[in-house]
Amino acid sequence: MVVKQKADYAALKEELIAYAYEIGIQKIGFTTADPFLFLKERLLEAEALDLFTGFEHPVIEERVYPELIFKEPQSIIAIALAYPSKLKEAPVSKKGARRGVFARASWGIDYHTVLREKLALLETFLIERLPDVRMKSMVDTGELSDVAVAERAGIGWRGKNTLLITPEYGSWVYLGEMITNIPFEPDTPASDLCGSCNQCVKACPTGSLLGEGKMNPKICLSYLTQTKDFLDEKYREVLHNRLYGCDTCQVVCPYNRGHDFHFHEEMEPDPELVRPELKPLLHISNRAFKEQFGDMAGSWRGKKPIQRNAIIILARYKDKTAVPDLIDCLQNDPRPVIRGTAGWALRKIGGRDAEEAVERALQTEQDVQVLQELTAIPN
C-alpha cells in the first residue's frame, strides 16, 4: 500500500487498528503531536514544589514538546494492554511463614518488555506499508507522559489517583506510545468520569493523592517501596505487607470493581513469586534474586529495597520465628540500611534473644544511622 492521499491515511489507520486488536492490544488511540501545554503547567508546579523523585525524564521541555525529541512529528499512537488484578490460588500468609506482596504491575514478565514487543509489531506493520515512515516508541521511561498521551488519544481519562482510567478495563492497563511522521486523524480525547468520587484520595495510606489528578510522589508508597535508603518510621507503619508497589488507589476505584483480565499469558503471575515468603528473602544472593525475580518489573531496583521491606513487614507481624534471621542480618550484613532496619525490627519484635543481639550490636556498630535505629524509641 503506497499512502499518498488523506483517504489513504484514513484507510491505513483502520488497518492498523484492526491489526492492533489482532495482536492482542486492548485499546489503541491517535492524537496530534501538538505540545502538551496543560502538562507543562503541572510539571513546572511540581518542580517548584520539589516533587520530582528522580525516576522521571529530567527535561520538562522534552516531556511537553514532541518536536524536541522527534523531527517533524505528525501524530502519536497510544496503546493500552489490560492486565490481571486477581491471583488464582493465592498462597496464604501464616504464622512462621509470613508473606509479602508485589503490586499487580509487577506480575508476570516485565510489562515494559511486553509493551515494547507490541509496539515493535506495529512498527513493522507500518514499515511494510509505508517504507519512508519514521517512528519513535516508548514505554514508561520515555520522554512523553504515557497518561497524557493516552488521555488525549481517547483511551481513557486521568483519574484522581493520577492513573489512566478506561471505561472498559478501569486502570488495570499498561500504556505505551509511538510518535510518527504519519498525519493520522486524531481521536476525540476522553471525558473525565470521576465526578465527585474521592475514594482513592481518601484511601491513600500516606496522603500522597492531592485531588484533581495531582500527587506528591515522594510520599507515595509505590515510590517509597523502591527507595534504597532507610525508610522513615511513619511510613514503615503503613507499609503493611507491601514488598514492591501499592495498589490501594486502584483497588478502591469503582471503575476497577469486578475487573480481572487474563488476556496475555506473559502477564500471568506466579503466586509464589508475587506473594513470596519473607524470611528466605533476607539471605537471597544476587544471582538467586535475578534467577527468581529478574523477569519481573519489581526487580529493577535490585534486592536491597525488597529485603528492607521484608524486614519491616516481619516486624509488623512481630514474627518471633524471624529473630534468628534478623540477628544474622544485624551482625553480618555489610549494608547499613539492612543492619539498621534489622536492629529496629528486633527491638519491635522484642524478646530476650532480640534484646541481647541489639545490646551486642551497640558495642560494635560504627555506622551513625545504624546506631540511631538501635537506640531510637520505636513506635
Curated annotation (Swiss-Prot):
UniProt remark on cofactor binding: Binds 2 [4Fe-4S] clusters per monomer.
Cofactor(s) the protein needs: cob(II)alamin; [4Fe-4S] cluster
Binding site for [4Fe-4S] cluster 2: C204, C220, C246, C249
List of catalytic residues: D140
GO cellular component, one term: cytoplasm
Location in the cell: Cytoplasm
Annotated 4Fe-4S ferredoxin-type domain residues: 184-214
Gene Ontology molecular function: any one: metal ion binding
BP-aspect Gene Ontology terms: queuosine biosynthetic process; tRNA modification
UniProt keyword Cytoplasm present: yes
Main location: cytoplasm
Purpose: Catalyzes the conversion of epoxyqueuosine (oQ) to queuosine (Q), which is a hypermodified base found in the wobble positions of tRNA(Asp), tRNA(Asn), tRNA(His) and tRNA(Tyr).
Protein name: Epoxyqueuosine reductase
Species annotation: Listeria monocytogenes serovar 1/2a (strain ATCC BAA-679 / EGD-e)
Protein encoded by which gene: queG
